[in-house]
């Protein structure tokens, strides 16, 4: 039985981390083997707080060892990683990806390098950003950063579309074959913008921006998951990008229409297989100015 190994956070209530990523990949036809880096009652933006705990790097390694014992690593089609709770967890992920690729050289590694955002800066514990930037992102086949995380990896500021394209080229030169920028903040606030860059070209996706009273959590995890599943279906990066962009819009639209701020992942599940809206991609190049 082939599957996707998904190593990221988990919440019991709502949809963030694995709680946002696992079901969409299953709905798209894939077995998923989740390993949680933390397990919380709910996501951390609830003003009432949350309960739960982080798992150790040894907890991750122990579960991966067990998967290896039953021959699962040879059948692993992809490793998807998101939020890591400690620098040591990043090292356990690095070791896991190495083991999976030794067992199955065709396996993909998709890294969502959760670090922070422009308005918040780096929000992760000491050592995590360094290990993401210097270890996990360079070894990944695909990275799914936001604008802040891309700027950290490319070691340059991003203020314009040209900056973003240049940053993606720098990122591709460091090892990854695909860069999906899950949120490009530097463009117009009238739309929500994403960018895809490969050696074949760079594509901009725009969709309407919803004015939520409280911003939903877990949309980035959803994007990474749907994109990973799309690639494993044999789609080109451009096709997988188009699909995940449209599908994510559908889930956010359902969430907005329901007056909720927890993603309506279950109610809108048909979006994962047949998105209800379509926003054509635009191929972009560096301006001549």
UniProtKB/Swiss-Prot annotation:
Key words of the record: ATP-binding, Kinase, Magnesium, Nucleotide-binding, Transferase
CDD domains: pyridoxal_pyridoxamine_kinase (cd01173)
Pathway(s) per entry: Cofactor metabolism; pyridoxal 5'-phosphate salvage; pyridoxal 5'-phosphate from pyridoxal: step 1/1
EC number, UniProt record: 2.7.1.35
GO terms under cellular component: cytosol
Cross-referenced Pfam families: Phos_pyr_kin (PF08543)
EC category name: transferase
UniProt-annotated binding residues for substrate: 9, 44-45, 221
Catalytic reaction annotation: pyridoxal + ATP = pyridoxal 5'-phosphate + ADP + H(+)
Single GO biological process annotation from the record: pyridoxal 5'-phosphate salvage
Listed GO MF terms: ATP binding; magnesium ion binding; pyridoxal kinase activity
Cofactor: Mg(2+)
Family stated for the protein in its record: Belongs to the pyridoxine kinase family. PdxY subfamily.
PANTHER family to which the protein is assigned, alphabetical: PYRIDOXAL KINASE
Subunit structure of this chain's protein: Homodimer.
Primary role: Pyridoxal kinase involved in the salvage pathway of pyridoxal 5'-phosphate (PLP). Catalyzes the phosphorylation of pyridoxal to PLP.
Descriptive protein name: Pyridoxal kinase PdxY
Organism: Vibrio campbellii (strain ATCC BAA-1116)
Gene: pdxY
């Amino acid at each position: 039985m082939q599957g996707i190994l998904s190593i990221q956070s988990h919440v019991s209530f709502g949809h963030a981390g694995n709680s946002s990523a696992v079901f969409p990949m299953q709905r798209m036809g894939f077995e998923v083997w989740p390993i949680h880096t933390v397990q919380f009652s709910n996501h951390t933006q609830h003003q009432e707080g949350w309960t739960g705990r982080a798992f150790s790097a040894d907890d991750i390694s122990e579960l991966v060892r067990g998967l290896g014992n039953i021959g699962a690593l040879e059948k692993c089609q992809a490793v998807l990683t998101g939020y890591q709770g400690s620098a040591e967890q990043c090292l356990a992920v690095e070791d896991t990806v190495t083991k999976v690729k030794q067992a199955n050289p065709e396996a993909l590694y998709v890294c969502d390098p959760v670090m922070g955002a422009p308005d918040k800066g780096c929000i992760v514990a000491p050592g995590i950003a360094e290990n993401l930037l210097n270890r996990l992102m360079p070894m990944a086949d695909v990275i799914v950063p936001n604008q802040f995380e891309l700027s950290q990896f490319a070691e340059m500021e991003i203020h314009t579309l040209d900056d973003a394209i240049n940053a993606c080229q720098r990122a591709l030169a460091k090892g990854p074959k695909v860069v999906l920028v899950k949120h490009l903040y530097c463009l117009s606030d009238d739309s929500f913008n994403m960018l895809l860059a490969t050696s074949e070209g760079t594509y901009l996706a725009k969709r309407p921006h919803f004015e939520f009273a409280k911003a939903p959590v877990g949309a980035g995890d959803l994007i990474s998951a749907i994109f990973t599943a799309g690639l494993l279906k044999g789609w080109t990066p451009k096709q997988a990008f188009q699909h995940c962009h449209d599908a994510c819009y559908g889930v956010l639209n359902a969430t907005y229409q329901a007056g909720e701020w927890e993603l309506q992942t279950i109610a809108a599940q048909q979006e994962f297989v047949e998105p209800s809206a379509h926003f054509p991609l635009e191929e972009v190049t560096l301006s001549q100015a």
